[in-house]
């Protein structure tokens, strides 16, 4: 909301044109067959599903990141296309570096909750594209 985005009611998003429109977001909605914590419609009209994950140990990070968020990212890319969705994770806590690299290789863009400037900068960078 601090970027000027408006929250809209959650709905099931079955095609790339459904769901929040440019400058809007919704919480807890289905994108395809998988639930996303937040879905943002970027200024360039791509969808950015964001998974919020907290891990208290590097062992736990496999479950949170690789077995959940990265699997969802792969599904979303397969269903909607790599040019139409930007799957992301907003992370807090302890994560194994190898698990982070594997998640990125699966198509997940990673941001950290302790520093929200990069995700805000990315979202703003889609303006005028």
Enumerate the language-model features and the residues they cover.
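Catalytic core segments in nucleotide and nucleic-acid processing enzymes
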Residues: 4-129
């Amino acid at each position: 909301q601090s970027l000027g985005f408006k929250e809209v009611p959650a709905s099931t998003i079955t095609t790339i044109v459904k769901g929040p429109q440019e400058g809007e977001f919704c919480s807890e909605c289905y994108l395809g067959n998988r639930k996303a914590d937040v879905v943002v419609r970027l200024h360039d009209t791509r969808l950015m599903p964001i998974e919020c994950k907290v891990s208290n140990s590097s062992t736990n990070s496999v479950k949170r990141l690789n077995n959940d968020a990265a699997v969802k990212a792969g599904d979303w890319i397969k269903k909607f296309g790599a040019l139409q969705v930007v799957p992301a994770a907003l992370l807090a806590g302890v994560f194994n570096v190898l698990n982070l690299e594997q998640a990125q290789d699966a198509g997940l863009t990673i941001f950290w909750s302790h520093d929200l400037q990069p995700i805000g900068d990315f979202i703003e960078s889609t303006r005028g594209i």
